[in-house]
């Protein structure tokens, strides 16, 4: 297994801290709004990593957090006259629904920052005791980055990073020093009683503490195997996490760092400030979650993905092919083709080379369809094909539906009944040799994007886009 390590800026062999075990921490959302396509892409990227490792024989522990203490949450809760707990719970539920729709496997642990306040306080106390942190006159506590000789080692390769972007805060020793604890400022602020005084943790200390409490190994030079997240988190968030972990515990946070690329909307970086954020829930109104997943995983996780509906519909054709083949082999039993399994897994073991894996899949779909055309009653072949498709379902998380359900996506139960009634009406018209009426019904349904297919077993229908 090879993965791209952001810190080393190259592909390296994955050599876990404990043989055949993989501990992964993925930075989750700050829950003050609905999740957007950037969140979806990150979740799917590292879901693919997890699935690949598991199918390669690793026991995977994946932790993905919820940041439920943050200035953005506090400000929005104040605006909507809600507590931060009420507001964050709304968006945690929304995020969970969205990821379920995208068939992202549930993490081993899903910690909330609010559940680990004591751990954060202990870590800050350690940093103060070791003289890596200092308090300013308003009670805030900062990490003194000048004490960490390796500060910047994770993100320094990115020449666009400028510490000056952070801005000056009165009494900070260096511009890049970052807040560990924000003291309670009175009205409209949120604070928790603690030995540090009333206040709340900074963003970066939240993740480091949750890593330590949920995943960290002891007696190793690294706490976990892989720390992952979006490229936008590399600096300052991941840099600061790495720094405070070194300072507090004398070890590196992660052996490997992985980052997924940005999502652009019509060739422009997606961001709330530009007003072009595309929420997952809005995309799901138009497209099934599996169709979205299939599209989002089709571009290598480190590349920029330029979201547009034309490409999405093109990618759907691949999913259609999977279900067409599945339709032909349902109800058979057999073993997977070992060469197919080996070849496609090796693609994914090469830093999740999904483009190459999909090429292998396309070849399998084409060749097995051709073999079925030549020998449609070959049960052994059908069983092998179904086993191949089952492996794709486990590896890529697509192709898991019943084909009939897939080809009727987006049609309500009442609409289905209306279609069935029309099919019966057409059947009667044909029996009475009223072929003009039968054709008229077919055309009427076509206008509703419903295609009819007459088979020896009767008429079936599908919805098309």
Give each language-model segment a name.
Residues 269-272, 276-465:
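Structural preference for alpha-helix termini/caps and helix-kink/transition segments
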Residues 66-70, 92-95, 105-120, 138-147:
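Short, glycine/charge-rich beta-strand/loop segments that flank catalytic centers
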């Amino acid at each position: 297994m090879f993965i791209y390590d952001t810190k080393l800026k190259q592909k390296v062999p994955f050599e876990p801290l404990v043989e055949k075990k993989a501990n992964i921490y993925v930075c989750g959302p700050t829950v003050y709004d609905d999740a957007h396509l950037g969140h979806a892409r990150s979740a799917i990227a590292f879901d693919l990593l997890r699935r690949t490792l598991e199918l390669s024989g690793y026991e995977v522990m994946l932790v993905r957090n919820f940041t439920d203490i943050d200035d953005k949450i506090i400000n929005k809760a104040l605006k909507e006259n809600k507590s931060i707990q009420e507001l964050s719970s709304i968006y945690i539920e929304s995020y969970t629904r969205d990821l379920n729709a995208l068939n992202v496997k549930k993490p081993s642990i899903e910690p909330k920052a609010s559940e680990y306040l004591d751990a954060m306080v202990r870590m800050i106390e350690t940093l103060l005791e070791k003289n890596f942190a200092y308090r300013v006159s308003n009670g805030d506590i900062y990490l003194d980055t000048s004490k960490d000789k390796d500060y910047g080692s994770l993100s320094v390769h990115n020449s666009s990073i400028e510490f000056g972007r952070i801005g000056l805060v009165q009494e900070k020793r260096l511009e890049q020093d970052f807040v560990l604890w924000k003291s309670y400022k009175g009205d409209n602020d949120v604070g928790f009683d603690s030995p540090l005084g009333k206040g709340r943790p900074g963003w970066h200390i939240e993740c480091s503490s949750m890593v330590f409490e949920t995943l960290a190994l002891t007696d190793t030079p690294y706490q976990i195997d892989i720390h992952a997240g979006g490229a936008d988190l590399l600096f300052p968030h991941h840099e600061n996490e790495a720094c405070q972990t070194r300072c507090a515990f004398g070890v590196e946070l992660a052996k490997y760092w992985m980052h997924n690329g940005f999502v652009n909307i019509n060739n422009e970086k997606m961001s709330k400030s530009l007003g072009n954020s595309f929420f997952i829930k809005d995309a799901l109104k138009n497209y099934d979650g599996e169709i979205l997943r299939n599209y989002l995983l089709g571009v290598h996780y480190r590349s920029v993905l330029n979201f547009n509906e034309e490409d999405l519909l093109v990618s759907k054709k691949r999913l259609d092919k999977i279900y067409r083949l599945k339709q032909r082999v349902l109800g058979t039993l057999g073993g997977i083709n070992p060469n197919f399994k080996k070849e496609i897994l090796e693609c994914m073991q090469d830093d999740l080379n999904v483009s190459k894996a999909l090429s292998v899949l396309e070849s399998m779909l084409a060749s097995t369809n051709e073999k079925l055309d030549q020998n449609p009653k070959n049960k052994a072949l059908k069983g092998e094909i179904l086993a191949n498709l089952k492996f794709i379902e486990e590896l890529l998380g697509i192709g898991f539906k019943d084909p009939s359900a897939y080809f009727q996506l987006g049609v309500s139960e009442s609409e289905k009944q209306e279609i069935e009634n029309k099919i019966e009406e057409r059947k009667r018209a044909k029996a009475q040799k009223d072929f003009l009426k039968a054709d008229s019904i077919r055309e009427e349904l076509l206008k509703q994007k419903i295609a009819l297919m007459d088979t020896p077993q009767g008429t079936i229908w599908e919805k098309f886009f």
